[in-house]
Amino acid sequence: RHAIIKVEESEEEISLLNCISEKQGKFTIYNSLLSEYGVLGFEYGYAMTDPKSLTIWEAQFGDFSNGAQIIIDQYLFSGEHKWKTQNGLVLFLPHGYEGQGAEHSSARMERYLQSCAKDNVFVANCTTPANMFHILRRQLQAKYRKPLIIFTPKSLLRHPMVTSKVEDFANGGFKLVIDDNLANVDKVNTLVFVSGKFYYDCLLYTSPNPRDGQISRM
């Protein structure tokens, strides 16, 4: 929706992400048909055929990962153990009841976490844009391939507090833990671990001044 712009006079479509550098890789984006089982099977095969490409499949908001559950269970979670083949496919799964009713939470965190075993997959719930950038970058920088599942709540797309500094993108790497810089470290008596959208929910009920409770992002 926002990756492609169109020239009004010529109807030419321009992908800005393909205009960053002459030495960059190729960026393509497609609207896939609503056959999650077939589409995710194709993406799994594409990622296996070209392990140097960052292949990402985003489930539509509305519990549409259900239709692809066979691929997720039989291939993503267990493929390496059964067939000794690695795969670096990335899944963006919308998460959370965000005012749309019971059928609008594509990713049940507990279900995906229960399927983690023997280093078979990465499951992430990123809190900052920079951390999400670094985990995607790490996906290709690594010398091996593992599936990566990222929970992507829609409410964070335009949240005014979900920002990162430019230097956070340019430096460092993926952080497993992000400390709370608003806490008074000398007076902390309560430590709360949260991740993703829950961190920003917590901020609504805390004071902007240094406090005696620390909220650490996992």
Model-derived features with residue positions:
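Non-catalytic terminal/interface segments that mediate subunit docking, oligomerization
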Residues: R1-K52, W57-E80, D168-I178, V185-L204
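Acidic, glycine-rich active-site loops and adjacent beta-strand->loop/helix elements
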Residues: A59-D63, L93-E98, P129-A130
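Catalytic or ion-translocation cores adjacent to nucleophile or general acid/base/metal-coordination motifs
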Residues: N66-A68, Q74-Y97, Q114
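Active-site phosphate/pyrophosphate-binding segments
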Residues: T85, E98-F198
